[in-house]
C-alpha cells in the first residue's frame, strides 16, 4: 500500500513523484545505524526541511528505528552562528547537513565552539569539496563522512564506519545493493573511469 509521496528536485527536468510503501522506513535502518551511527543514548541532528525526502531518511525513520532521540532545529534562514552553540548546549552526538551548510560553518571561528559531544559528522545532497573536508577537520577534529541517497530510496553509497573517509569520496555501496557505474550504453565502467 502507498504510504507517502515525495517529489524529486527536478535535476533532469520537472520534479518527478516518488511513491513509497510502508516498507520504506525499514530501508533507512542502515542509513541511521551504519552511516549516521546514531546511538540510543545520543541525540541526532539532521538539517533538512520537511519538504525533502532527506527529512524522512535523515532524521526520522531510521533514527527512530535505532531508538535515537532527534534534535529539531527550525530556522527561516540558516545562520551558522546560531547553530554552532547548540552542539554543546544540547549535547548533540551525531550530525548531518548538506555541504553548503558546512561551507557556511567553516567561515566561523570554530575554535570558539565545543564539539566534544559530537561523535560523527555526515553530509549528503551535493558534492563536498576537499577544502571544506580538510578545514572542518582541522578546526574541529571531526572528519565528515559523505553519503549519497535519492528521493527514490535510502542511502545508496556512504562512508560507513569500516571505511576511512577520503575527501571527494562518497564511500562504498550500502550492503542492501549491488551498484554498478555504467556508461551511456548501460555497460559497466572499468575502475578509474571518470
Where on the chain are the PLM-derived regions?
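Conserved AMP-binding/adenylation subdomain of ANL enzymes
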Residues: 26-43, 50-93, 108
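Short Gly/Pro-enriched turn/cap motifs at secondary-structure boundaries
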Residues: 168-174
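Conserved beta-loop-beta connector loops within the AMP-binding
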Residues: 180-194
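Gly/Ser/Thr-rich phosphate-binding loop
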Residues: 65, 92-97, 106-166, 178, ...
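Conserved AMP-binding A3 loop
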Residues: 3-27
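Active-site beta-alpha turn of Rossmann-fold NAD(P)-dependent dehydrogenases/reductases
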Residues: 6-9, 48, 154
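Active-site phosphate/pyrophosphate- and oxyanion-stabilizing loops and adjacent acidic/basic residues
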Residues: 6, 30, 134, 168
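Generic short beta-strand
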Residues: 6, 178-179
